[in-house]
Amino acid sequence: MFIIGTGTATPPHRYRQQECWTTLKASARFGEMNVRSKAIMKKVLMGDNGIATRHLALDQLDHAFEITPDALHARFIKNAPMLATQAAERALAAAKINPPEIDAVLISTCTGYLCPGLTSYASERLGLRPDVLALDLVGQGCGAALPNLQTAQALVASGHYGRVLSICVEVCSAAFYLDDDAGVLISACLFGDGAGAAVLSPTAGSGRRVKWKSCGSLLQSGDRDCLRFEQKNGMLRNILTPQVPALAAQHCETVFADTLARNQVKRRQISGWIFHPGGRDVLLALREKFQLSSHDVRQSEAVLRDHGNMSSPSVLFVLQAALAEGAPGGLWWMSSFGAGFSCHGALLEVE
């Protein structure tokens, strides 16, 4: 399987972290927080956390405090189909593929629920064929891009589906929740909105040759409570614990070692690193575990700086950035991780 085109999309409104702090301080919600919570929010929004700006599906920042089930769902249904469609259109254009040529579409999300799913909306807007195979994948959190691509690879390998459209879209601002839990507060300061897409084909395209060589996954259910969504008061509430950076690095290294061993590849052969930018501390833990420099993970750091953690689309933003930069070819390691606790990785052969 080859990745023959990628595309990304974000909401039009982009906010600096300092703007978020200023708006929060002026809100009624801020007055309801305890002293510790206020200090956490100030430290994360005003400190050096690796994030400068985030794109949010909010016409005004103070709309972030409209935290009711109906308001959050309305935000998701308004923005998720639009972002998914925009990213897909750009991926199709990059691949030089017309929508009717797509045989299957897969969409991953964890920040909202629709029935029929997002594939119904995106397929209609894109003009995909009525007989397209449409699969909605949910519940995989920040790591969803790689399982989505693994599913696409299985469809392509079956010989029944030629070109597959893979989309990840998250409206994290439709899953904001505020209380005095540190993980909840940090989540509100960390996550942004966006969508990423890729077109997959059994043959290479006209651009850079990106071959899906091999992949691996790891599911550690014993660590489930370290990172997951729960339902509270009819809304999603993110559980984010301090163990996440270490767990991400540990499990990523396990998947990496297993995948390389199966493919008889040595670590020194890896020339590119495409990591999900889960946060500053996550990237630092990955750098330490893999003995990498800031330059090695520069695309991940840049995506985090400009967009925050967008959950599942983030790693597709990093891949697109590396390709656009003209990063040296060879074997690239692409990895995502998230709720489960799950971790996924893929070897890409790039020319």
How does the language model describe each region?
Residues 57, 80-95, 151, 195, ...:
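Short, well-ordered amphipathic alpha-helical segments that serve as non-catalytic structural scaffolds
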Residues 99-103, 130-133, 158-164, 185-186, ...:
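Short coil/turn connectors at secondary-structure junctions
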Residues 1-78, 172, 178-250, 254, ...:
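Condensing-enzyme catalytic core mediating Claisen C-C bond formation in acyl metabolism
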Residues 114-120, 166-186, 216-233, 279-288, ...:
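Active-site-adjacent elements of ketosynthase-type condensing enzymes
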Residues 5-7, 108, 138, 165-170, ...:
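Short beta-strand segments
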Residues 41-134, 139, 267-283:
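Conserved beta-ketoacyl condensing-enzyme motif
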Residues 92, 110-111, 121-124, 129-131, ...:
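Claisen-condensing/thiolase-fold acyl-transfer catalytic domains that form or cleave C-C bonds
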